[in-house]
Amino acid sequence: MKVSVPATSANLGPGFDCLGLAVSLKNQVIIRPSKFHSVSLKGEGANNPALKDNNMFISIFNDFYQNLSHKKRFFRFEFQNEIPLSRGLGSSSAVIVSAIASAYAIEGIKLERDKLLNLALAYESHPDNITPAVMGGFNVACVQENEVKYINKPIPKSLKAVIVVPNRAISTAMSRKTLPFKYSKEDTIFNISHSSLLTAAFMSENWEMLKYASNDQVHQKYRMKQMPELFEVQKTALKEGALMSTLSGSGSTLFSMAYTDDSRNLEKALKNKFPHFRVFVVDFDNTGVKIEL
């Protein structure tokens, strides 16, 4: 059995804790019955032995599998990770979603996506991360009475994600501590209006509106101060043809969107100016979690 989950870019522009989308960097796990427990890990995080010894996927998988099956079995877990760790691309959400989906699939129990989404909420309280991981595409999401309420919109093939991944992380916990305890009425209105406009731009596919709608006063400028070169990355991306350029999650990755025809020039400009950072040009993912038995 094989399960894959896409990377996500959440806190999209002004959409703090409510807007997110999925891109086609994926984490994949193959699970096989075995006589004893074993783990192999390739790709991102392969050089970190702690991920084998203290694996969040296996912990969540075992909890669900034992509750569903009421028996103990051994498995071989083969991980192939494309999502950079601790860089604001939803690697934790991918682990949570894939672990729960795998436990149900191994037992042959059909799991509706909405139920999977709400089971994942117990481990990840921010719906802008887990919703695109499950559903793919662009998502507007909130939590109401312990359930995720969302609207999903596929993203056309004519657009690409251009992702700049710095060589160091920004801690999510530390990143949240940089945010103000209170916001002014002006900044609050700014973000409500801009997140509304950003949502409308995605839903109507008015891509030229993104450069205005993606502005933010609530979180990006505070978080990006921890890595000031991100301001220059953002400025360069917008100058070189990006439709929008925003911090991904809590950072340190910077996410940009561009027309397919412009994406390679944008990639080249970013690689030339920031050779110590990784730059990916990838499709958007409209599938979300995928299970192959």
Swiss-Prot record:
The name this protein goes by in its record: Homoserine kinase
Subcellular location: Cytoplasm
Molecular function GO labels: ATP binding; homoserine kinase activity
Family per similarity comment: Belongs to the GHMP kinase family. Homoserine kinase subfamily.
GO biological process: threonine biosynthetic process
Keywords: Amino-acid biosynthesis, ATP-binding, Cytoplasm, Kinase, Nucleotide-binding, Threonine biosynthesis, Transferase
Domain of life: Bacteria
One Pfam family here: GHMP_kinases_C
Keyword flag Kinase: yes
Function: Catalyzes the ATP-dependent phosphorylation of L-homoserine to L-homoserine phosphate.
Chief site of localization: cytoplasm
E.C. designation(s): 2.7.1.39
Residues noted as binding ATP in the record, renumbered to the chain: 84-94
Pathway as given in its UniProt record: Amino-acid biosynthesis; L-threonine biosynthesis; L-threonine from L-aspartate: step 4/5
Entries under InterPro entries matching the protein: GHMP_kinase_C_dom, GHMP_kinase_C_sf, GHMP_kinase_N_dom, GHMP_knse_ATP-bd_CS, Homoserine_kinase, Ribosomal_Su5_D2-typ_SF, Ribsml_uS5_D2-typ_fold_subgr
NCBIfam families named in the record: thrB
Cross-referenced PROSITE patterns: GHMP_KINASES_ATP
Organism encoding this protein: Aliarcobacter butzleri (strain RM4018) (Arcobacter butzleri)
Cellular component GO terms, alphabetical: cytoplasm
Catalytic reaction list: L-homoserine + ATP = O-phospho-L-homoserine + ADP + H(+)
